[in-house]
């Protein structure tokens, strides 16, 4: 979701990521974009319930179009992917752990939307690169060997 927010910002759209300190209040003119494989993620259910009371429209990207989040959504984009939480809902299987295939499918879907928006807005890669960060911090992951499980 964060990478999609960043791409939308690159397109020149006014975008905020829920939970960041610089995110302003929402209103009925805003669109909330939510991704949840199961459609039952409790923190998202809480956020979307409040957003709906404020008149915010929501687009949901999910595996389960009958979920709690789906019932609150203005629009649903169903993504076919296996999920250990939703084995009853489809016969799809993956050797990847947990919701990996949903997350990968979500990223590809978002990148496709970005390309379509670029076409609609008359933008190309060079134009949107001008909105890319030019001051970046170092991001890294630190894993301590003695804190890992030996397999």
Where would I find each of the regions flagged by the language model?
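Charge-rich intrinsically disordered tails and low-complexity stretches
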Residues: 106, 110-111, 130-131
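Acidic-residue sensor for enzyme active/binding pockets
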Residues: 103, 111, 147
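Glycine-rich phosphate-binding loops that contact phosphosugars or nucleotide phosphates
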Residues: 2-108
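Conserved small/polar residues in nucleotide/adenosyl-binding loops
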Residues: 140-148
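A short, charged, Gly/Pro-tolerant segment at domain boundaries
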Residues: 119-139
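Short glycine/serine- and small hydrophobic-enriched flexible loop segments
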Residues: 111-119
């Amino acid at each position: 979701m964060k990478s999609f927010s960043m791409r939308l910002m690159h397109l020149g759209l006014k975008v905020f990521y829920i939970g960041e300190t610089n995110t302003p209040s929402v209103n009925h003119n805003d669109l909330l974009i939510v991704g949840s494989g199961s459609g039952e993620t409790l923190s998202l259910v809480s956020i979307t319930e409040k957003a709906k009371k404020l008149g915010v429209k929501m687009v949901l990207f999910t595996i389960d179009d009958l979920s709690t989040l789906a019932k609150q959504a203005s629009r649903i984009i169903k993504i076919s992917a296996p999920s250990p939480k939703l084995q009853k809902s489809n016969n799809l299987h993956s050797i990847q752990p947990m919701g990996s295939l949903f997350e990968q499918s979500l990223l590809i879907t978002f990148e496709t939307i970005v390309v379509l928006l670029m076409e609609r807005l008359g933008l190309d890669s060079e134009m949107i690169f001008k909105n890319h960060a030019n001051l970046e911090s170092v991001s890294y992951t630190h894993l301590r060997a003695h804190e890992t499980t030996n397999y």
